[in-house]
Amino acid sequence: AAAVPMLLGLSISGVSMVGSDTGGFQEDASAQLFARWFSFSAFTPYFRSHSADDTRPHEPWSFGKNVLDISRHYLRLRYSLIPYIYSAFYRAETEAEPVMKPLFFEWPQDKRLAEVNDEYLFGPHLLAAPVTSPDTLWRHVYLPQGTWYDFWDDTLYHGSSDYLVAAPIEKLPLFVRAGSILPNETARMHTDAERSPVLFLDVYPDENGQACGELYCDAEEGWGYRRGEYSLISFTFQAGSLEVTCENEGFTPPWNDLEVRVHEGIPAAADAADPEEAFTAD
């Protein structure tokens, strides 16, 4: 539980490349702890699994098929989001914008957020709410101002409100800010592997039907980007149309095709004012 506020503190102190040793290196992680830890770490800037000589094996497959499947799922998701994450690091490099930041950093006027240290923004558009307690199937979240999409099923939530959301072992509560465009690609085995030719843009319109996002890409090695050898592309979605603007064209993007996926959103069934109505139990 301490990992989230620790990483957020480092992030706003100017250290953007932060992460935790997934699985730990003291004592033995349980299958449940490792699965939760792995899903959380997939949404941190620095992501790696860890073990030690005097602990049980902490490789994902050492905890059984269920944990292995969960680990594979989040690893693939992480790799598919490389264009989004890499673009967030561009802002960290040029503007000292934290890749992972506490919510009060973005909404300082919301006094509730001064007490929230277990949710955070990952990049400009994703809000992660990791599960840090054992044997948990539901998770309380407070969503800041605006409208939010559930990343997994496109349920819409109104901000400045509390919710109780389902959080089974395989699900990290994850939300997308309305008005966002997420660039992503087909997951690869490793970052040196050949890319799929298709760049995906997932569009999450706000209440006015608008959304925006950006994509940064370069050679991913060397210092050429400091000589202008990079591409910076902005996307604007409005009235059902997408506008693409190249702000810098010093590098040829590695994708040949563009596929746009517009998310419509499904209104949440539960009343935000009474999170207990989010579920019933016999």
Predicted region positions:
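Intrinsic disorder/low-structure terminal segments
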Residues: Y46, F104, S234-T236, G250, ...
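Catalytic-domain carbohydrate-binding cleft regions of carbohydrate-active enzymes
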Residues: A1-E170, R177, E221
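Compositionally biased, intrinsically disordered low-complexity regions enriched in proline and serine
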Residues: S87, D150, H158, L164, ...
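Compositionally biased, non-globular sequence tracts
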Residues: A273-A281
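Accessory, solvent-exposed terminal regions and/or long lumenal/extracellular loops of proteins
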Residues: K171-D274
